[in-house]
Curated annotation (Swiss-Prot):
Residues 24-148, 191-215, 381-400, 432-462 are annotated as: Disordered. This is Nucleolar protein 12. It comes from the Eukaryota. The gene is NOP12. Residues 137-146, 383-397 have a biased composition (Polar residues). Residues 108-124 have a biased composition (Basic and acidic residues). Its main location: nucleus. SMART domains: RRM.
Length: 462
């Protein structure tokens, strides 16, 4: 029975369970509020810790907060240099010019060492500054190379040559056609003119003049050029000069004589001006420092024949006083007169005497013309257009040379004045070799090779 009771339960215990359940549902559902209010409140209490343990925990917390702050600052500093700068697009030329980039880097490193380090700036400003620096370095390097290879042609050699050159006007035409007259003319220019004037003087000279004469001045004539030649036919100048087809009515030309130094120029202008050579009064003047035109001592002569010569004016105005020079204005293409001239006297009082010859005939006969004589006036030339050369690029010294060259040099040199010349190396000439290379020796005449070649030639000849 006990096994059955264990399996199916005891009848007594079932009765007790039913009684307890019945008692539970039989009780009233109303809750007594007094009991609830009088019930004590339960409070959970934490276990107490020691004071030493609390202090250690506080120290660890403060140390952890400090270490976290330091780590954050280090991370921020590492992140700033790690930021990549924006790469700007560069031209193909900059990528190709490795030398320019290398020089810019070297210059940048040297500047960074000298200058103190500043605070880091924005990435955009750094990239812009680098681009500007590379552009400036590139322009400076390439600019110096290109500018150093070009030079402005200021004709400095021609200006130095003009300092040693004298102008000789009213030279007889026979100098070109006759060798004898040419030798006499060259002898006149290469001789000291002061020796001839000493014979005519009374012998009373100042000490300064004696000291100047004792100085050794060499009158070495390097070259003589003839200009203002009038030809009879309209042929090229070289062809007409070779055939000597000169104009019959024009019996005078102009010449330029170049000396070895500038010392004889002043002496020749002083003593040779107005000298008679083959019945012609020579007019000698310096090329770089010509004698000024004085309006008070000169007269204007108009209504001249186009074929008029200087000697007729010398003879016509010689009774008025000592003449310094006679200048007939001529055409640059035909080298014939334009119909007017200037006569300058040594004394201004001779001008009043020359004015009395107004409307008087210079020649007798059919070709006689009444001259129109008047005082000279200073007529300033209208300034032409400025040259195409940019004077802003030139310094003061170059501008002075340019201005002198325009007044002194001829047409051919003035046309090439101010051009940019590229500097080139010297061309190789025959016989010039480098010192490293050894010249090959000539073949010996008694050697084996020469003997065999001679024997071979004899065999073929037979």
């Amino acid at each position: 029975m006990s096994a059955l009771n264990n399996l199916f339960g005891n009848s007594k215990s079932d009765a007790a369970g039913t009684s307890s359940i019945a008692a539970l549902f039989s009780k009233p559902n109303h809750v007594d509020e007094r009991k609830v209010k009088s019930k004590a409140r339960t409070v959970l209490t934490e276990p107490e810790q020691d004071k030493d343990e609390q202090e250690e925990e506080n120290v660890q917390e403060s140390a952890s907060t400090v270490s976290e702050g330091v780590e954050k600052e280090q991370e921020e500093q590492e992140e700033q240099p790690k930021k990549k700068k924006k790469k700007t697009k560069k031209n193909d030329e900059e990528n190709d010019n490795l030398e320019v980039q290398y020089y810019s880097k070297v210059l940048g490193d040297s500047k960074s060492k000298d200058e103190p380090k500043d605070e880091p700036k924005d990435d955009s400003s750094d990239s812009d500054n680098e681009d500007e620096a590379t552009a400036v370095d590139k322009s400076s390097i390439t600019g110096t190379e290109s500018e150093s290879a070009k030079v402005i042609n200021l004709k400095e050699k021609e200006l130095a040559k003009a300092e040693r050159t004298i102008f000789i006007g009213n030279v007889p035409n026979e100098v070109i056609t006759s060798k004898k007259v040419y030798k006499e003319f060259k002898k006149l220019l290469s001789k000291d003119p002061r020796s001839e004037n000493d014979d005519h003087d009374d012998g009373e000279e100042d000490e300064e003049e004696e000291e100047s004469k004792t100085k050794d001045v060499k009158f070495n004539v390097e070259s003589i050029r003839f200009r203002s030649i009038a030809f009879e036919e309209a042929l090229p100048r070289k062809v007409a000069f070779v055939h000597q087809k000169l104009h019959k009515s024009r019996d005078s030309i102009n010449a330029y004589a170049v000396y070895g130094s500038s010392n004889p120029v002043k002496i020749m202008c002083q003593y040779l001006n107005g000298k008679v050579f083959n019945d012609h009064h020579l007019r000698v003047d310096s090329v770089t420092h010509p004698s000024p035109h004085d309006k008070r001592r000169s007269v204007f002569v108009g209504n001249l024949d186009f074929e008029e010569v200087e000697e007729s004016l010398w003879k016509h105005f010689e009774p008025c006083g000592d003449i310094e020079y006679v200048r007939i204005i001529r055409d640059s293409k035909t080298n014939m007169g334009k119909g007017f001239a200037y006569v300058q006297f040594k004394d201004f009082q001779s001008v009043s005497k020359a004015l009395l010859l107004h409307e008087k005939k210079i020649h007798e006969g059919k070709k006689a013309r009444k001259l129109r004589i008047s005082r000279c006036k200073n007529m300033r030339k209208a300034q032409g257009n400025q040259s195409s050369l940019q004077n802003n690029k030139l310094n003061d010294q170059q501008r002075t040379k340019l201005g002198r060259a325009k007044k002194v040099l001829g047409k051919a040199d003035r046309a090439k004045l101010g051009e940019e010349l590229t500097i080139e190396g010297l061309r190789a000439s025959k016989g010039e070799t480098t010192p490293v290379l050894k010249r090959t020796k000539n073949r010996s005449k008694t050697g084996r090779v020469t003997k065999r070649s001679i024997a071979f030639k004899k065999q073929n000849a037979q």
